[in-house]
């Protein structure tokens, strides 16, 4: 894999890099973050909280970073003035995706999936999973918080919008989502919440 790509979504810079399966993402993320912040990788002030979420606070209070790896790729995000989460998912057949959705998703999302034929159902399942995981990574609890505690739905233009979320996550209207194909067969999502709204 030789993919090198970068994007800018609002206040967030993102980079996609090749990544060796089975290796931790943090060393490579530190390299990218250090370059972007103008410091040596070992001086990037990443600290993990009790749940394992990496933070740049308190040293860089207006910055946030996150990363995700899937397959042979690593996605790294660096934001200013936001709390962010990223997710990268390699799309692969999920024969029991409705079982997974029934177990983890919000009832409104399950209803959306049930109404679809298999191909669009799988596409929407991965979009929902990726969006939800990115938001929960931004929040700092990960999947253990509960995927059912937030609900996305496609807007008329097809973009996913957060319809509802547990009040602990803040106001649904303040969350922003960007989703895209980061690489062949790899779906990416970025969720961010303005620090000024916390």
Regions found by a protein language model. Give the residues of each.
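Core catalytic alpha/beta fold that binds nucleotide/phospho-ligands
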Residues: 1-198
